[in-house]
């Protein structure tokens, strides 16, 4: 029941992203619920939630883009990373920073850029240019704010996590 409620909140949070004026750069708090689920129930649950949220999100909130399964893999592995880094661990700023660093750099910058290049048929040089000039700066810019928000939220939810996690 708790997973379903948090998953529903995660899906609702997808509706409330704030555009920044750049192409796909939006401020969203979906990752907070994603991390909370993985922190409470572990890496496999995080992986499954990633698969479900990306797939259901595509059908519930269509944005005109094509469904592209490698992005679903990105969401699933991100959930796995959240679970591996946060499950049954004390909420510490260094741990949250490391988790976000892994997700931002490996999943968002590297995997996300490769998916972007593959989806749009870009050659490797163009994909690398996108990675270095757009994806890397964007993810570095948001690393500290995402870490801070995630730390504050997970710290606030720690008593609930201790009560309801398995």
Set out the residue ranges of the language-model regions.
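Loop-helix junctions at membrane interfaces
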Residues: 1-166
